[in-house]
Amino acid sequence: MKKSFIISAAALSLFALQARGEKLGELLHNFTYQARIGYNLGGTAPIGMPATIRTLHSYTLQPNLLLGIDAHYPLDNKWGLMVGLPFEGKGMKIDAGVKNYHMTMMKGGEQLEGMFTGNVITKVDQSLATIPVQATYDVSEKLRLKLGPYFSYVTAHKFEGNAYDGYLRQGDPTGPKVELGHEDGERGEYDFSSDMRNWQFGIDVGADWYFSKRCGAYVGLTWGLSEVFKKDFHVIEQSMYPIYGTIGLSYQLK
């Protein structure tokens, strides 16, 4: 009797495992996978142009490549879910004119803090591993829309630059005046890399267009909702957010 019970229990367990395996296999079979390559274009900036930033002299493109893979699961013939893992760069280099812009910088081995009027060059480099989780809607067989949150871990970051051709009023706009020139040694240097966050999150919206069965193109926009700097960082008075557009190509693996 006991032996029969053990055999029956073992058989039921095998049937249950087989049924679960079939369901898991069916679930995995419905996934499709894509590889992506793209380019990010944008910047780390405040929301709205503050009055202290007067002009943008130049914007220099950076090697903001994106390489990733994502998986899509259809919920019905229109809606689905997509999750991905892109490794990407988000960087910028700008030259801007500012007035009464609060800054901390080094000049001649001395730290200066106050209100700067003149020109600033800022370079931002970030390397990130990102997980977007998006709802998808298939407008047609060729066009898919996507929207959802993203979460990024910043594996490396840099925020540095220099101030030149202007002057710094130490402390406040009426403080002692320090002249800054154009040549090396005459500029004020700054580096806020250690004040940047390691985690970011925001909204990711985009569209995929398939021009063949496996190949396609895509566009996207990632809008950061978390500031790039830590809470206790107050040198730059405006909150700074990563805002980038993406354009690229995709290839369906399965």
Feature-to-residue mapping (PLM):
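Outer-membrane beta-barrel channels and translocator barrels
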Residues: 28, 74-76, 140, 212-214, ...
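Residue-level signature of outer-membrane beta-barrel architecture
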Residues: 71-73, 137, 153, 209-211, ...
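Repeated loop/turn-to-beta-strand initiation elements of outer-membrane beta-barrel proteins
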Residues: 78-81, 142-145, 213-219
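Outer-membrane beta-barrel "beta-signal"
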Residues: 209-210, 241-254
